[in-house]
Amino acid sequence: MSHNPIRPWRNIERRKSRQVRVGNLMVGGDAPIAVQTMTNTPTEDAAATIAQILRCAEAGADIVRVSCPTEESTKAMREIVKASPVPLVADIHFHYKRGIEAADAGAACLRINPGNIGSHARVKEVVAAARANGCSMRIGVNGGSLERHLLEKYGEPCPDAMVESALDHARILDDLGFYDYKISVKASDMFLTVAAYHALAEATDAPLHLGITEAGGLRTGTVKSSIGMGALLWAGIGDTIRVSLSAEPEEEVKVGFEMLKSLGLRTRGVNIVACPSCARQGFDVIRTVETLEKRLAHISEPISLSIIGCVVNGPGEASLTDLGFTGGGKESGKMFVNGRADHNVANADMVEHIVKLVEDKAARLKAQRDAEEATEVPAE
């Protein structure tokens, strides 16, 4: 739950779901909402895939999905799994044997698509491999690849068809005594996706993986995903997310975290509050923010920073952030620390000064967190 006793209108009551394990990560229940992305390198090229996974992990990815379309790709998974610092989900379509091979290779989770995985007997074999290797599974329904009998029944992809597909396959896993699974019901149609997830959330306690599939490029995909997934997250629905963009996977991770940060569901990195700028600005706000976003991208500790061009809203915004800079002086501005006006800084020195303040604060926060973790008593 995102709980704010002072501002209760910001509270989000998360849907109660059961927990499943994805490698060393717990998903569902009261676990943090996990941010996922997917590699786009040929999986057979282990070196390129590992390099991309490492970049995604550096950006903050909790889970990375890897497509396994060929026997060569599942062979490469052994090397990839060993080198990955985060749990890997093997993406399986059409060829159920790839799921068995991926489980044997060390994948933490198997994603299967009910629309193309095949018969009950094939699913049973995949489940046996998952159980034997400690894998969880994801039932990944997609509006673009629904089973033929459901399309004939409903006429087109619709919420009822997607939920029926998901629950039919959930029952197969339940009947096999396998409960370590999460479910997704994605479509490129935002309205269809949101409606399907709301219906699914009422019908199961399985963790739900959110996404608007084939959302588009960096700008359009971010907007569409933020509206659709943001509405679901605000309603308390969702245990893992993936922002599907026609962009590098690291960008998906960044957008995913910004979405969660905006809703108060996760905190990571610097949250910059900035004005759009106008004629009153005392410095170039747009260029300054662009520079700071790049210079502070390596910070993982949660820090809020306001960059406001003038004194109309600057002091008020700065009073709500850890650090803040407000323009208004002659080629200078006021630096706020912990919500209070602290000192003046020349515009020419502002970026370097802010970067140092943020890095120093991040170092203190990390040292404090490390000390707290070192003194924690292990659970019996």
From Swiss-Prot:
E.C. no: 1.17.7.3
Reaction(s) this enzyme catalyzes, per UniProt: (2E)-4-hydroxy-3-methylbut-2-enyl diphosphate + oxidized [flavodoxin] + H2O + 2 H(+) = 2-C-methyl-D-erythritol 2,4-cyclic diphosphate + reduced [flavodoxin]
Domain of life, source organism: Bacteria
Key words of the record: 4Fe-4S, Iron, Iron-sulfur, Isoprene biosynthesis, Metal-binding, Oxidoreductase
GO molecular function, one term: 4-hydroxy-3-methylbut-2-en-1-yl diphosphate synthase activity (ferredoxin)
Family: Belongs to the IspG family.
Protein name: 4-hydroxy-3-methylbut-2-en-1-yl diphosphate synthase (flavodoxin)
Source organism (scientific name): Hyphomonas neptunium (strain ATCC 15444)
Organism ancestry: Bacteria, Pseudomonadati, Pseudomonadota, Alphaproteobacteria, Hyphomonadales
UniProt gene name: ispG
